[in-house]
């Protein structure tokens, strides 16, 4: 699902787990069983796959677009994060708060051991090819690659508020900055080039993640935004959707809904 999917793997095993993220410890206490899997903090999922649930959730769309950019300082010790939220509807109130999560992909170590309780569970074979790997693997798995690993976080237990100004006006972007500080102190990090920043927009009334975005981290003096590149004074496309509300990154055959940086929204017929 590419950039449509934002995964965060939270390890809370303490000293027994080298990937433990202490910043997530208080939020992790909301979930008593391990492992557990949920979507948008409001839908508990099964352990094996959730394609149907994901596609249904994606098709619903959201009341706002969320984009994010991130850049290192020269010492690669601090990361400046700039979320950009554009609402599709007017609202008088703002029950929203932000959470910021730093993740790393492709983490592994020959000394790490993953205990595999599904080893030999042949009755479950065929659910997914990924799950078949664990069925065929030994009880103790070495050299397992860990992705989406939470490294640092803020606002995951109590979302940070005060950044969305009211009344909210449709098609008027709102942005602010947040800084991940002293990243070099996170000894868990293996490869800074594999880090990504996730921004979660959370409804404080419901506890639900309303929308989110992720991005890589640019080098100093450059800018890379998750889905927007815009020159000053230049009208550019900022978002594209299918008729059923699903956000897409490239034109797809049929009718596309296109939003532009000057606030215009138009229908575009793509024939090939």
What residue spans do the PLM features occupy?
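Acidic/polar, low-complexity intrinsically disordered N-terminal segments immediately downstream
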Residues: 1-2, 243, 267
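Conserved beta-loop-beta connector loops within the AMP-binding
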Residues: 247-253
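C-terminal tail/sorting-segment detector
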Residues: 255-272
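Short polybasic amphipathic segments
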Residues: 36-40, 240, 256
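Short, ordered coil/turn segments that flank beta-strands lining enzyme active or ligand-binding pockets
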Residues: 205, 243-245, 261
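Residue-level detector of functionally pivotal "anchor" positions at catalytic/ligand-binding pockets or at interdomain
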Residues: 214-246
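Short, conserved sequence motifs used for protein processing/export or organelle targeting and
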Residues: 3-221
């Amino acid at each position: 699902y590419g950039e449509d999917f934002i995964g965060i793997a939270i390890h809370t095993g303490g000293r027994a787990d080298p990937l433990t993220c202490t910043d997530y410890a208080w939020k992790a206490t909301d979930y008593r069983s391990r492992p557990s899997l949920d979507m948008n903090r409001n839908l508990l999922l099964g352990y094996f796959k959730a394609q149907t649930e994901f596609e249904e959730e994606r098709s619903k769309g959201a009341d706002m677009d969320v984009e994010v950019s991130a850049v290192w300082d020269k010492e690669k010790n601090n990361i400046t994060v700039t979320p950009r939220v554009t609402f599709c509807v007017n609202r008088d109130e703002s029950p929203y708060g932000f959470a910021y999560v730093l993740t790393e992909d492709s983490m592994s170590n020959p000394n790490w051991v993953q205990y595999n309780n599904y080893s030999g569970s042949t009755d479950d074979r065929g659910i997914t090819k990924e799950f078949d790997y664990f069925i065929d693997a030994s009880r103790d798995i070495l050299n397992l690659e860990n992705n989406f690993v939470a490294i640092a976080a803020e606002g995951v237990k109590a979302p940070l508020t005060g950044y969305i100004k009211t009344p909210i006006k449709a098609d008027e972007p709102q942005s602010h900055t947040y800084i991940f500080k002293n990243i070099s102190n996170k000894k868990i990090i293996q490869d800074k080039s594999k880090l990504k920043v996730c921004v979660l927009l959370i409804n404080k009334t419901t506890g639900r993640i309303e929308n989110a975005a992720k991005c890589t981290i640019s080098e100093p003096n450059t800018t890379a935004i998750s889905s927007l590149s815009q020159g000053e004074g230049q009208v550019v496309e900022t978002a594209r959707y299918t008729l059923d509300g699903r956000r897409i990154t490239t034109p797809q055959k049929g009718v596309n809904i296109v939003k532009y940086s000057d606030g215009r929204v138009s229908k575009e017929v793509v024939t090939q």
